[in-house]
Amino acid sequence: MESDAGAQQPPEASENSNMYGGYQTETESDPLVYKSDNNHNPGSTNLDGPNSIVAQTEPNAVSERRTSVLQQADDVLPRHSSIDDAIASVARQSAGFSEDFLRRDSRVSASHSSHNEAGHHADSEQLETRLPVPENVQEHNNVSNTENHESTGAPADDSFFSELASRPETSEQFFSTHAQEEITPLVDPLQEVDERRESFPWEESKEGADFFSSLGNSEHNQTPASGTEEHEQSHVSTSFNEEETAITHGNEESIPWPSYDENSHEAHAQHTSEGAQETDSVAPSAHTVHESDSTPTPKPDSTNELDELFAGDDDDFLQEIVKDQEPVTSNGNQDTKTPSSQEPEPAEESQVKKKDSFAFLELDDDLLLDDDLLPDEEDEGEINSNATVVQPQTTTTSRYSRPSQPTSTSSSFSKPVAAQEFNKKLEEAKKKHDAYDFPSNLLHSSIKPAPRTNNKYAAPSGSAGSPNSASASAPPPSSTTSLPLHPQAAPGVAQENRPPLQSHSSAPNQAPSKSPAKKSFFEELPIPTPRAAVRPARSGPSKPSPVTAKPAVGQAQKKPTQPPVNPYAMQNLKTPSAASSPASAVPQVTLPNAPVGPVPPVAPIGGVVAPGPFSDMASVAPLPQSAPQNSLSATPNTTSQPRKLSNAGSSPYVPKVGPYGPSGHTRHHSRASSLVGAKGKEVNPYAPALSPVNASGGQMSPQNQASSLSAVAPPTAHSSATASRLRRISNPRSIYGNAVAQQLKPVDPNIRFQKQFPIFNWGLNNNVSMIPKNMQRNINIKQLTGGAFTEILKSFPGPLSKKSKAKDVEKWLKTKVTHLDSSTPNVATNEAKLSDEVGEILAALVASNGDVRSQEFISTACSVLNPHHYSQVEAMATPQGSNHSATAYKLDNSGSNQLLTYCQAGQTDRALELCVAAGDWALALIISHSMGPQAFGKTASDFARTSYPFQKSQSKLNHLMPIILKVFSGNVKSIIEDFQNVATELEWVLLHWRDVVTSIAANAIQNGKVNEFLNEFGQLLASHGNFIGRDVCFILTGAPLSPSFSVVGGDSQMGLFYTEIYEYALSQRSAATANTLLPTLSVKLHHAQLLADYGLNVDSQRYCDQIGASLKTTKQQVPPAIIHEFQRLLVRVSDTGANDQSWYGGIGKINKMWGQLDKLISGDENTEKKGETGLFSKFSPSVSRNASTTDIHALDRPEFHSMVSSMSAPITPGEQYGRTPSSVAPVTSLSGVSSSQTSNPLTSVPRYAPPAKNSRPQQSPQQPTRSHDMAPHSGSRYAPSNASSSNLGNPEEAIQSRKPPSKYSRPAQVGAAFSYNNPVAEASSSSIGSYGSHAVPNPPPATQGHTKQPSFNSIVSNDYSVIRDHNRSPSVQSDISLDYPVDFRERIAESKQESEENADIKQLNEIPTNGNGNENTQAQSSKDQSSPLPYANQSGTTMDSTEVASQQSQQPPPPPPKLTQTPTQSPSRGPPPAVSRSPSQPPKANPYAPGARTNKPRGRNRYGPPSALGSNAPSVPEVNGNRASEEPKNVNPKVHEEKTSNIDDSFTSSYQEDTQMSSPSLMLNHNQGAINQTERPNSKFGLGDEFPIPGSPEVTTRANSVYGGHGGFFSSRLSQSQQSTMYQQYEVTDDTVQDYVPVVEEEDEEEDAPKSQSSQPAQNGSKSAANAKGQTGLFSIFGMRKNDGKPKPIRAKMGEPMKLVYDEEMKAWIDPSIPRDQQLKKAAPPPPPKMKTSAKPSNVPSVGEAPSQQHTPQTGPVLPPGNSSGPTPKPIGSGPKPPAPRAGTKPQLANANLDDLLSLSSQPGAAGRKPKRGARRGYVNVMEQ
């Protein structure tokens, strides 16, 4: 078409022109063009075709590409109504243009491959393939090249554009690409160009047209990827010179664009990015020019206008290009073009509207520069061959060329030959029309944004080889300018080449990176060759990445201002911001890839420049302003693979980034996320690490990214994707390494605190703690309502026993069904139904008292299982006579005769065979029955099989009848075999098991085989998973519970109840004797746990009681796991306070009884003890006492330390059996840890091992530990060290005793008692004393072989001490000794000081030494003459004397009795005297500690008499209590033997010579005096005088009650052995009562007054005894009594020896250990109440009167609680001697037995006395006065 026609073409034509050329960004009439200009970098001309143009239409990268394409389109396309017309016009005007242009372009493409590979080469290749290249193209190119700066453009031939039109990538493709790139409506640039046509004289000249066409080709080849659109547009519009024309027509190398400085190139790059729009606007002008060439409408001012345009340009870029032809062509062109574009801007301002069409020239300059960079390597020769003029220009490398910018260099052809052919075609077309030498193919190639070169990713590519050089090296693949046509183009190459398509923006960038990295880059790329075919399309875009490094930098600088590109936004979407910065599109890509400022592109791995990281993104939206993007790509791109990021960004599978989306994040983001394994959304799109991902081929180098705008077009994206994938392969690590690192960044470290599994926890009550997964730490507490099940659980009348009422069980079963039906009305599962049926059957069984043979039960059970059957039976009429003939076979006469013959002969077997063979089953059955059950069963089975053969039908007759007949016949085994062998039978019975069960069970009464069948059938059902059916079968048979049948009713929760009910029903049978404990133990335990879970702790405790009681009596082996769970449940329930009503909580009731007994004996009433049911009532006092038993004041005592050190030495097993301690025996340091205990536990004797024959009393300064499990073991964290359990008699210990105590050891208290338990075992066991003296507990030693194996009960209670045949473990004794308040013991000590000391000394003398004089002991005893031996608190053997000593230490020491200690005294067999405390020693803070004393007595025993206020009566017999106050003398060993014989071995056998497992009952010998205190102390209760009534539960500790006593599991009472021992020990005999003075109520108080006065000491003594007695009790164990250091009432321990001695002189019972004066003081009784005076005064109280006046320790009244805190009365040890018994009716108190004592109170007075006036009228409670 004519140029005029083109000038006047309608808007459609202009739009089409815009589509291809992207010219006139100013012409907003064409939305596509305008956007193309804005978004498209001039250097990134849409060599890929319209799509590429569209991609360039994006604000930044798109603008570059589009600008270059549009400008080139301006050069090539005339202003016609359509592109086809423009092409035809150009082809007609310049027939040889295409050919010449193609020839030149082939060379240019070589240079273009690196500079404008994605640009012009793709287009030229497409033109070559699609357009007939006119022969005059070469000629025209030469002419255009020779035309230096002539403004006259060579006329473009329409044939060229015809060829363009013939390309598949026409306007439609362009629009498709634009559609993808969000091209906003643009003003039709053609219209504006038409308006400005007259100002373009070159349009009229063919030369001008050719010039512009060639220039357009060059520009397309060199489309700078950097944002030089602006400069190029202005330059093109203002200063199109003949040089430019020549350059345009010639190859890039030959294009003589004026070279410019790098600064100008950078500026040009910036302008290119900015002027992409201008370039686009110029491109239309170029089209106009070409069009004018086609329709010669010469503009006379064309040349002048060109001069004006280049007037500001001092450098003749065309000449410079000619000088530096090659370099300038590739890089120099860009650089030169950039200045030209920069300089023309001023002129452009005046002519911008008219000369916007020249923008493409500017872009073309960049492209030419890019081409020059490329031709430097390959295309130079080609270009020279194509165009002589162009070659020299191309040869001259532009000074601005940069090898580091390979992006700009993109070969226009994949192959040089194709490029030459294409040049020829172009030249031919240019001859016809030189206005637009960039066909749509070229536009496709513009996909790659040139500005990407600046991208730090592109910069590395430049280093590897400038994109120009790279593209030049790979021109063949990238030669075609239409990048979109060749998605295969290498990512690095194609992307680098793409920027050249955007030559305007990329040219400057290409210049810096041109030659160095051109060839090397593409040569290194393994991709170029495979992409060669594709590269023509991508070649243009590929070069932008390297070349555009600078433009990218400039654009990158612009990009930061723009919002980050959305990686998922459409690339075509164009925003005003994007439009405002067209060149920034390229910077998008380049910015991330290249650092700010021109950075030489880093050579990609393999020498190939990687495509721009975010090419597509850049094309999509201006990434330069997105700082995050920049940061993303900055590091990775600069380092190595900038292009990879671009590729990653342009992945065809990744949505195009919107104008606001970060460019290049599209692909790399997803890739990074995939690498990290996190969700794509979690990946930070701005993370620099993500940018390196070039995975998406769609993304190209920064320059390519500009062209990647066109990459939005499917071809471009595909090519870029391919390139990116290849690039990705080349350097995966660099791409993904950073991405992974940065993707890890967004991970929230607190995610684990927010996203967790729900937390669910059952509380002790109805509370459930649950934290749902999505709750934000908000805890909502809701009441757990179990619904119907909770009601069922609460209402269950368990635990069931024989005493339970059957009606309650039946009622519960009915209520259960009601609750379940109401709670789950819609739930009618088979299992629920079966469960209900089981419940009904059990109810019937309970109603029948467990008789499974009861017809009522069987009928009920069968009706429950098969109700319909029984309803039918009832409806059936009674069978009447039948008229039907029998169908049975019958023997004929002959057969009958034969049968008769057999029967007569006795051959019944043959007769049976005859009947069976004849089918006469009646006779056969009868005969077989006579032969026995086996024959009968076989015959019946044969009959059933014959009559009812196996069938597959579901008929009951054929299946059920044979079963019944076989059962009747007793052939049960064959039935089960049939079930197992015949599948149909098994299937039927499993489905109809109810029918089978009911049919058989209904006949259970008549046939004994029914149970056998039901059992077998039940097992068969269970083997097939029908457990409820099995349970029904077993219930019907009355099978006992067994391990295989331990749960009734299946595994549901109802099974807990059903099992217990079934057990209960069976127990109702009189014959039910089987112990079902073990089978149901786990069920009951689970039931108890379930109750505890639901907060029903009381009910749970009842189950625990039952289980514990059963375990006590069972002889079966209980699994340890069950025991462990049971113990845990006990502790759990006891902690909730539900054990008040527990099986051991009943102790309170027992205590009440004991209290009544105390009241009866002592005549005192106990007020209710406060706090006995308080919060801490359940805690054993030992817990608190242990912590407070340390006597700080005794720490520095040497004697104390000596004792502690001696005690710290453990006794070896050798010592235990009389051997001296071995030299290797472990020595326990004061720290309580034995060196050998830890290393060799066998060296230590077990705690419960029987003591050695030579075992010596051990001193436990502290209180004894609790017994059983509650007692801290040495290995327990609560276990005190064993330092105090050493043998004082041991010489080594004596040596140790002199050693200073360890800083870790806690010194034993002075008043500590010696324990007589097994020293060796005690070394292993812990005691409170040891606990006090040692902070570090000793590990429990290994059990020795001599120890007894624990019984089941002991295992259950974890207490081996429960196993003892009168050999009580010390811990048990210690438990009881804990109950005795220290104050009381102190008071006792005071009262019996003398006697105890004497007795102790005697005992020590009696005890033989181990061969080593116990000088230590002697010294201690000599020091402590006034202090008796302390109680053996730890071992439970209480030395009253020692306790008294400790007590006396609290009080002012009375004058020491005459005590002589022989130097041979040895504590080896007796307790060594304890070191007495100094009187000044402050009382212990712990009232419970031994010897601790407070003004108030601590808690008193609720059931025991209150502590005596005013007496320290020697209620506790001395060791030598029988002796008077005379001086102690050596007692003969017999005393010791007797003593030991009376000692309760169950509490301590350490004092016994032989480890006797039991000791004979203690016979209190009056001749010998009160049994030595060590005897009674040996009792488990520590204080002999405090020993409670045998079996009194008060003596038991909570540990014993909780964890079991000796009697069995968690026994709350003393074991039988303990009780028996106590009874034996305290067996009452006549002589035992010598000290017992019952209270006799005198009817005549007046008469009793003098007696009471005279016998007051005896009363005080009895009071003290009663006080001492009252100290023992359950509450004393729990710390409920007041232990204030004052003597407490002592319960009467009948049969227990007393240490009081009746003094004839004083006429009173005195304590030899206490000075008489003191006793006399205290002996004065309070005045009796005023009663009628006695007529007959008595000077000496009679024996009968003594009880009323003298209260012996055993019978002394118990002080009321109020008086317990009063001052302590003085002991009455020095009371008057008892008078000689006078003849009277009353029995002598000394010889009175218990009955006599009890009768004294009710016995009438002496003869002649008045009858008793009141029940207690004569009783005087002295303690209350």
From Swiss-Prot:
Acidic residues: bias regions: 304-318, 371-382
Topological category with respect to the lipid bilayer: Peripheral membrane protein
Gene Ontology CC terms: endoplasmic reticulum exit site; endoplasmic reticulum membrane; ER to Golgi transport vesicle membrane
Cell location: Endoplasmic reticulum membrane
InterPro entries: Sec16_CCD, Sec16_Sec23-bd
Domain of life: Eukaryota
Keyword Mitochondrion tagged: no
Record's compositionally biased regions (Polar residues): 39-60, 214-226, 272-282, 294-303, 327-338, 500-513, 626-650, 693-709, 1179-1188, 1279-1289, 1344-1353, 1406-1445, 1543-1576, 1651-1674
Main location: endoplasmic reticulum
Keyword Protein transport: yes
One biological process term in Gene Ontology: intracellular transport
UniProt feature, compositional bias: Pro residues: 1469-1485
Residue spans of biased composition, Basic and acidic residues class: 114-128, 193-209, 262-271, 422-436, 1524-1542, 1681-1696
UniProt KW keywords: Autophagy, Endoplasmic reticulum, ER-Golgi transport, Membrane, Protein transport, Transport
Low complexity: bias regions: 391-412, 458-485, 576-585, 710-724, 1227-1239, 1255-1265, 1324-1333, 1459-1468, 1611-1620, 1789-1808
Record region (Disordered): 1-67, 106-356, 371-590, 620-675, 687-726, 1165-1188, 1206-1308, 1322-1353, 1387-1696, 1712-1825
Family to which this protein belongs: Belongs to the SEC16 family.
Function: Involved in the initiation of assembly of the COPII coat required for the formation of transport vesicles from the endoplasmic reticulum (ER) and the selection of cargo molecules. Also involved in autophagy.
Protein name (database record): COPII coat assembly protein SEC16
